[in-house]
Amino acid sequence: MKATIAQLDASLLAREWEALKHHIAAESPDMLLLPEMCFAPWFCAEPERNVSVWNAAVSTHERWIKRLPELGLTLVVGTAPRNEDGNRYNAAYLWTAERGIQWIHRKTYLPNDDGYWEANWYDRAPIDFKPVTIGELSIGLVICTEIWFMGHARDYGKRGIHLLLCPRSTPAFSNDKWLACGRTAAVVAGAFCLSSNHAGRAKHVALGGAGWICDPDGAVLALTSETQPFITLDVDLAQAEAAKRSYPRYVDDRPI
């Protein structure tokens, strides 16, 4: 299947959207992974929650999600701020041309430090990491910080995922660290690891871009940049299936 990763500057969203549509028209991918809460500027750079800013971001994401059919795709994955039963969540969605929007995961591991005051802005969700199946494709979601908790990658791999998807918003100074994590998570899961990231600036935070596609043995197949903000590659789902039978994935780690 052909998969697209992206880095997006939320302050230039209208322009970025048109460029993304052009790329998709040229490459005809089967799926697109968007960055974490990408349809509004990164508001978590502010340490104090502002209810008006939060609600505006929720509304903005709702409007942009309604525009996903413009891309002409069958499958899009991303995250959005969401009000749910009196709580605020960073929720992952799966959009398909056939069924529209499905909410498939909510972020549970929340950073709370300079530029990333997420625990101040929204609620921690219960721990719930379940693969999602779309036809013959199986995906697992880890939203940004969640990828560091490798037990979930291992569990997803045992449950047969092909793609480990990591929408994120991370700073430029940490790009090398995050890529190392993505490569490791791919190996642990025995799956392709895809990540899309914010670019540009949010207040004093320089956002890193550098979305990636890593194969199940951790090789970096693609890395986005300012000059190449969108990349589409063929990923062989059979390679992810075969990886489950090779080292280190086959090792028995059940308690004895």
What are these regions (language model features)?
Residues 1-5:
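Extreme N-terminal starter segment of soluble prokaryotic enzymes
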Residues 21-98, 172-191:
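Cys-nucleophile CN-hydrolase/nitrilase-fold catalytic domain and related Cys-dependent amidase chemistry
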Residues 14-23, 147-154:
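Short, acidic/polar
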Residues 31, 137-139, 163:
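Structural motif
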Residues 7-13:
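Short polar catalytic/cofactor-binding loops
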Residues 77-79, 90-94, 130-132, 211-213, ...:
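Short beta-strand scaffold segments in enzyme catalytic cores
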Residues 57-74, 148-229:
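CN hydrolase (nitrilase-like) catalytic-core segments centered on the catalytic cysteine
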Residues 83-159, 174-180, 242-249:
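Active-site catalytic loop in hydrolytic enzyme cores
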